[in-house]
């Protein structure tokens, strides 16, 4: 712990760490109580902020010339079931002017929405939808918060740690019916339809010329 900031092992060069620490101290002073935690690791500064302040924080990071984080990289989620606020929403930004990155995190639970940041970075639209789809994290103020990757009528959120590995239904193409069918998951081998011509499963076929490759 140095001047209120955690510097983890395998950080960047001493000069670079000093620059990031200076930026961290500046942000802590400017943003005040919005910043809950700070850390430097792997050439990046990470801030944990209050969810209610995420729009103000990202706006400052974008507009402050000393920050210049104008490139929005992505949003992702993380699930820690043992915590009271089990979810992290993680924002990654890039400053081309200063050649550095920053990671901003907020923590929330299943019922508490996180403010949408579309007004700050319009590209966050589909990333927030993806995070909602895969984790069930809600975003208040989003104009079209619906699933993005999973199918119509999908139940649950597949990247939650308590989501079953097999899922709840199996989707397959039924040769007899000539259509895609949804059925409860069955683990019996008799149920599986092996594609023996697939290079990923099935037997090893002997092809003409294979004998030449034998030692």
Swiss-Prot record:
Gene3D superfamilies: NADH:ubiquinone oxidoreductase, 30kDa subunit (3.30.460.80). PROSITE patterns: COMPLEX1_30K. This is NADH-quinone oxidoreductase subunit C. The keyword Cell membrane applies. GO terms for molecular function: NADH dehydrogenase (ubiquinone) activity; NADH:ubiquinone reductase (non-electrogenic) activity; quinone binding. It comes from Methylobacterium sp. (strain 4-46). NDH-1 shuttles electrons from NADH, via FMN and iron-sulfur (Fe-S) centers, to quinones in the respiratory chain. The immediate electron acceptor for the enzyme in this species is believed to be ubiquinone. Couples the redox reaction to proton translocation (for every two electrons transferred, four hydrogen ions are translocated across the cytoplasmic membrane), and thus conserves the redox energy in a proton gradient. It is found in: Cell inner membrane. Keywords: Cell inner membrane, Cell membrane, Membrane, NAD, Quinone, Translocase, Transport, Ubiquinone. The keyword Iron does not apply. Its EC number is 7.1.1.-. It catalyses: a quinone + NADH + 5 H(+)(in) = a quinol + NAD(+) + 4 H(+)(out). InterPro entries: NADH_DH_suC, NADH_quin_OxRdtase_su_C/D-like, NADH_UbQ_OxRdtase_30kDa_su, NADH_UbQ_OxRdtase_CS. Pfam families: Complex1_30kDa. SUPFAM superfamilies: Nqo5-like. Its main location: membrane. NDH-1 is composed of 14 different subunits. Subunits NuoB, C, D, E, F, and G constitute the peripheral sector of the complex. Belongs to the complex I 30 kDa subunit family. It is a peripheral membrane protein. One of its GO terms (cellular component) is plasma membrane.
